[in-house]
UniProtKB/Swiss-Prot annotation:
Compositional bias segments (type: Basic and acidic residues): 7-19
Taxonomic source organism: Mus musculus
Occurrences of domain Rho-GAP (ranges): 914-1102
Gene: Arhgap39
Taxonomic path: Eukaryota, Metazoa, Chordata, Craniata, Vertebrata
Site positions (Arginine finger): 956
UniProt-recorded name of the protein: Rho GTPase-activating protein 39
Length: 1107
């Protein structure tokens, strides 16, 4: 070696102790290695990391032998393992009486001596990355120019960056983002030296460096000075930031003494063998690197760097994605990104001595890089943060040959959610469109490699199967050389659908692609496979049947997963969720069928079950899950006078409705109980799955046999000894058994001393007071109304469910299941089927008893039928309404009058929450001559009778919630008590009636006109006259009523001028349908202005005396 080279070697190696071959006293820096597949000899320097094809001159070389073992390091288990190139064996324990070649250290050194792609990417004739393809010979001829030897012996320093410089930067451009770049230029403009400051994950004394795992570049491609090491270049100084240390990853590549530059990623091909000596260096290699802010992908013409070890010939599987070491801490504000560089489709990988290089990833593979069951720990897909103690040992080598068939897909970065614990998939500024594949940025497909079974340490894979591995997903950062022994210490997993017939089922490799669950946005990726495969067959010569089989198996796996998890992914794009899209609900196959077991209507929305069943395995970013979970509890919206036990379900249900509206095609109002879309229950999921995870294990009989889930979900005349749902609350455990007895009493299945209304009152009071009992109560009601062959008991069970829903909803966890159960009974056709079937069973039982000569029981007249559909429709409406309002507000517990009213409301609808036309129909018998709703006029008169126009803060100060509830109960019975004293009570109830109208007082189709003409009195009045007659009459009566309060004499006392009245009354007349807070905020001001204009300018004299 030259003196400069020798100085470079000795001043930049990582370890202070130079390596020695075990069993020898002579220091040997060069070793001979025979590549296992091509049987070609290679020579590596264990000190500098230099690799050459030809034997170096003037040095001793350790020849290869049968007893030569290569020492490698597995980062997953932090253990060394040993590979024999002669026998292709891999063992854990260090072999005895043999030569150990510490290639782990060599690999670490090579990782520290590589730099991003230099300006040679600008070579003429190079096809651009935006879709152009060339022949298989073109890249080889171009690379002949690229690998011309550099006789001047120029050295190259490593640039370690946090940003993927090759996948997003144009040729000759170093993307300056998230790191600092230091450059030295010579007088003629050539780049003499550049490097970056070390990046740290943690502050403090313990420095953790970033080893670039996913994108290694040939270090010799970076132009440097003329024959000098980086630190000793004349005319350029090695600049460093103050306080930074020369970290081990800033190493220098030294070419061979004869000037021949070895391409470590090159494999001999039919077109190119070795680089010939040349007296001149290619001008492409010395172009100065120009800073630029533009971002475009780098050239794909360089051959990629192959794995050191791959899977055994018997089988193979997609990689397992491993997380960084357990002791590495990450800062919360660090961006994590995935790169997607490319490589030449015309080059076969060199089979040996590579450092990891980011492989092309299609959109089908972007979301694959998440760690299973560790969403909080899947981080960088491009870098592996490791401490100094790992840098000197770890070997990061790619799992298998990267696919030259798939172009680089769009780049994405996984950014931590400020909420904590979740990660969001965000488009990178470097997003590009792959024109050749026609893949749009944002079209993703999710794939998952199967977990391997325990097996031996890794062994090489033949080239034929390496090509076939190109369809598999690529390995994450912390994966070692192929499949290291640590990656096999995973639990067993079901064999993949796409397992190739030639693979063995005894070892650790899985299918060709492994299990690849897909999201709903997968069609663009699937469509792009055909052209990709055709191109691959053209340039690589991969057998067509093998790729066709792989593609078919992959699509079969997609279809299998889609069918299996169809109900678990609430897709917004293709509508494959459970929205009915106008479909008529399917009738039940019969009442005997366990309806509750089939009623999974919205089971996939249960967040815990959904995450646990599918995407926990994938480690999906939580932000992706949040859109598909309809019931969440992260918002709370308690209201004044709210009972302490009601705040949680209020916010959760409000969030549920908000999420449900986001999925609907026509978003309903956020402050109204809209006409809810009926939904089909999912046939793929079953509540028994949920029950098996949440139910207690019940036993029966002397031998304590376990009760099946199906029997636990069917009607029972026996009592229960423990709650249906697993709970740790002692109060719930005690009350659950008592509630079940009370339910049996109310339904007539158990003798009761108290009146049924008082039994229902006790049940409703317990559920209203203790939120933990609500799910238990509803699951018991569902059980007792399933396979119940007594018509009276069945009717009472549904009646009790309606009573309970009038006071409190279930918790969000059980909301979807109850909704699905109710939905299944909303078809009126089933009422006749249930009644007929029950009568047939009764007749059959009576015949059996007559044959056995048993004394028949006294005949009890059964009702002709049960209107289950009527109960179900009412319960469905109350359930959706409770999702917005939550449980009954106030401090007073339910009373008998409220129970009676809730019982009668099933067949006698309330005036609150109904449409104007329905309210007029209700009062037609009592008040046939009235043109206005009785409730509106009666409450308005009551406000004035109590001197509301002389009461300060009228319509602004709320009335006592308990008194408002009591008055509402009376009004629903067409009564108004005479003992009222506070005008705020009827005023609050009047506002409640306006607010709870099924359709707003000013219909939605007129909303935009109102917002547009909020400043024009003429246009505003014209909008009022265009309303339907009943709406116009009610609105004009309201305006005339409010005009009383804006009189100057009244305003002086009430402190409620026209602006204040418009502010408090506008939300009761106009309802914004947008969910955008900015739109709501802006429209609120316009709504108030519109109502103020009406109060000031609308002529309501024609309403004099109208009732």
């Amino acid at each position: 070696m030259s003196q400069a080279q020798d100085y470079e070697c000795r001043s930049h190696h990582v370890d202070e102790q130079e390596p020695r071959i075990p069993g020898s006293s002579t220091r040997l820096e060069w070793v001979e290695i025979i590549e296992p597949r091509t049987r070609e000899r290679m020579y590596a320097n264990l000190v500098t990391g230099e690799c050459v094809w030809d034997p170096p001159a003037g040095v001793r070389i350790k020849r290869t032998s049968e007893d030569q073992w290569w020492e490698l390091f597995d980062p997953n288990t932090s253990r060394f393992y040993y590979y024999s190139a002669a026998s292709q064996r891999t063992v854990w324990h260090r072999p005895q009486n043999c030569d150990i070649i510490p290639l782990a250290k060599l690999q670490t050194l090579k990782q520290n001596t590589e730099s991003p792609r230099a300006s040679a990417d600008n070579s003429p004739g190079r096809g651009s990355r935006d879709g152009s393809t060339g022949s298989s010979l073109e890249p080889e001829l171009e690379e002949r120019t690229q690998e011309l030897p550099v006789r001047s012996g120029r050295a190259t320093t490593l640039v370690t960056s946090k940003e993927d410089t090759s996948s997003c930067s144009p040729p000759g451009v170093l993307l300056e983002k998230d790191y600092e770049v230091y450059r030295d230029y010579s007088a003629d403009g050539q780049l003499l030296h550049y490097r970056t400051s070390s990046l740290r994950w943690n502050s403090g004394n313990k420095e953790r460096m970033l080893i670039k795992v996913a994108d290694r570049e040939p270090s010799f491609l970076t132009p440097q000075g003329n024959g000098y090491p980086a630190d000793n270049q004349p005319g350029g100084h090695h600049r460093r930031p103050s306080g930074s240390q020369h970290s081990p990853n800033l190493q220098t590549f030294v070419p061979d003494t004869d000037g021949t530059v070895f391409f470590p990623e090159r494999r001999p091909s039919p077109f190119l063998r070795r680089a010939e000596l040349s007296g001149n260096c290619s001008p492409l290699l010395i172009q100065p690197r120009k800073p630029s802010s533009d971002s475009q992908p780098s050239s794909p013409r360089y051959g990629y760097e192959p794995p050191l070890y791959e899977e055994p010939p018997v089988e193979y599987q997609a990689p397992i994605y491993d997380e960084p070491p357990m002791d590495v801490q990450f800062e919360a504000n660090s961006p994590y990104q995935t790169g997607s560089p490319q490589r030449s489709p015309g080059r076969k990988p060199h089979p040996f001595l590579q450092t990891t290089k980011q492989t092309p990833t299609s959109p089908c593979q972007q979301l694959m890089r998440t760690k299973q069951k560790c969403p909080e720990r899947f981080l960088s897909l491009e870098y592996s943060p490791v401490g100094k103690e790992y840098v000197r040992q770890l070997v990061y080598v790619e799992q298998a040959g990267s696919s030259p068939k798939l172009r680089a897909g769009p780049r994405h970065k996984y950014a931590p959610n400020p909420g904590g614990g979740t990660y969001s998939l965000q488009p990178s500024p470097c997003l590009l469109r792959d024109q050749r594949l026609g893949v749009r940025s944002g079209d993703y497909s999710t794939m998952e490699g199967p977990e391997s079974r325990p097996s031996q340490p890794p062994t090489p894979l033949p080239q034929a199967q390496e090509d076939a591995m190109s369809w598999s997903s690529q390995q994450d950062t912390m994966s070692s050389t192929g499949y290291s022994p640590g990656t096999r210490k995973r639990k067993n997993r079901k064999p993949s659908l796409c397992q190739v017939p030639s693979t063995s089922s005894t070892d650790g490799a899985g299918g060709l692609l492994g299990e690849q669950p897909l999201t709903e946005e997968r069609s663009p990726c699937r469509a792009s496979l055909t052209p990709v495969k055709a191109e691959a067959d053209l340039v690589r010569g991969t057998p067509e049947p093998f790729l066709a089989q792989a593609r078919l198996a992959w699509e079969a796996q997609q279809a299998h997963f889609h069918m299996k998890q169809r109900g678990s992914w609430d897709s917004q794009q293709d509508g494959s969720g459970y929205e009915s899209d106008g479909a008529v609900p399917l009738p039940m196959p019969g009442p005997v069928v366990r309806a509750f077991s089939e009623d999974e209507a919205l089971a996939q929305q249960d967040s815990k079950h959904w995450k646990r069943s599918t995407f926990d395995k994938l480690g999906f970013p939580q932000i992706l899950l949040e859109k598909s979970v309809s019931v969440q509890t992260n918002l709370a919206s308690p209201e004044p006078h709210l009972h302490p036990s009601q705040s949680e379900d209020l916010g959760a249900c409000a969030q549920f409705e908000s999420s449900r509206q986001n999925r609907s095609a026509m978003p309903s109002s956020s402050c109204v109980f809209p006409t809810f879309t009926l939904r089909k229950p999912s046939s793929e999921t079953d509540i028994e799955n949920w029950a098996s995870k949440h139910f207690n294990k019940h036993t029966q009989g002397l031998f304590r046999r376990k009760v099946s889930i199906a029997n636990m979900l069917a009607w029972s005349s026996e009592s229960i000894k423990k709650p249906m749902i697993v709970t740790s609350d002692r109060h719930v455990k005690k009350e659950a058994c008592e509630i079940f007895k009370l339910i049996q009493m109310y339904m007539g299945d158990r003798r009761a001393k108290a009146d049924p209304l008082h039994v229902a009152l006790e049940i409703a009071t317990k559920g209203w007071s203790a939120q933990g009992l609500r799910d238990e109560l509803y699951i018991q009601l569902c059980r007792q109304t399933t396979e119940n062959f007594r018509l009276e008991s069945l009717a009472r069970g549904w009646e009790l469910m309606a009573i309970c829903l009038a006071f409190f909803p279930p918790t969000p966890k059980f909301h979807s299941y109850l909704e699905g159960y109710i939905y299944r009974h909303m078809d009126p056709v089933n009422d006749t089927k249930v009644t007929q079937h029950i009568k047939e069973l009764l007749e059959r039982n009576s015949k059996k008893k007559s044959k056995l000569r048993k004394k028949p029981k006294p005949y009890v007249e059964e009702p002709d039928g049960v209107a289950i559909s009527t109960y179900a429709k009412y319960c469905y409406h109350k359930l959706q309404k409770a999702a917005l309002t939550g449980a009954k507000k106030g401090l007073k517990k339910p009373n008998v009058e409220e129970i009676r009213h809730a019982k009668n409301a099933v067949f006698s609808p309330s005036m609150f929450g109904s449409a104007l036309q329905e309210v007029m129909s209700m009062q037609k018998e009592r008040y046939p001559d009235r043109q206005l709703p009785w409730v509106q006029t009666r409450l308005s008169e009551e406000v004035l009778a109590l001197n509301g126009d002389q009461t300060e803060g009228i319509f602004r100060v709320p009335g006592d919630i308990d008194e408002v509830n009591a008055l509402k109960l009376q009004v629903d019975q067409w009564k108004v008590p005479t003992g009222l004293e506070d005008p705020h009570v009827p005023a609050s109830l009047l506002k409640l009636w306006y607010r709870e109208l099924e359709e707003p007082l000013i219909p939605h189709e007129f909303y935009e006109q109102c917002i547009a003409h909020y400043e024009s009195p003429e246009a505003a009045v014209a909008v009022v006259h265009a309303l339907p007659r009943i709406n116009r009459m009610v609105l004009c009566y309201l305006i005339r009523f409010l005009q009383v309060f804006v009189q100057p004499a009244n305003v002086a006392i009430t402190k409620m001028d026209v602006s204040n009245l418009a502010m408090v009354m506008a939300p009761n007349c106009l309802r914004c349908q947008s969910d955008d807070p900015r739109v709501i905020f802006e429209n609120t001001r316009k709504e108030m202005s519109f109502l103020r204009v009406l109060i000031q300018h609308l002529d309501t004299s024609f309403m004099e005396g109208v009732l």
